[in-house]
Amino acid sequence: DTMDVWGDGEQTRSFLYIDDCIEGTLRLFESDYSDPINIGSDEQVSINQMIKIIENISGVSELKKNYQLDKPKGVRGRSSNNDLVKKVLNWSFKMKLKEGLKKTYDWISVETSKVGSNLSRFTKS
């Protein structure tokens, strides 16, 4: 299996599990706060590190990576500063990246094993 990676994979990001995103957003909607605020995770990871986590979860020994250095890779590092949301809404993410990826992987495994499953919905970016 080969995975296309835009850039060298060393760019860092923070990811937020959907349940945490919904909880933070609902808490914001229910509050009186009306200024911009970050709802995110403090857990920062490189794309290469995330691929390694996915390899471990999936049981794949090592995916071949096709580093596409000519593709846009965005900023070198991006992470959410969540100090304000913690202070104003008393909210913080709960789901660690590894746990969220495992839940997502398990869900996709169930969905793709169903007879007549439309696999293309999992392969588009």
Q: What are these model-derived regions, one by one?
A:
Residues D1-S125:
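C-terminal substrate-binding subdomain of Rossmann-fold SDR/epimerase-dehydratase oxidoreductases
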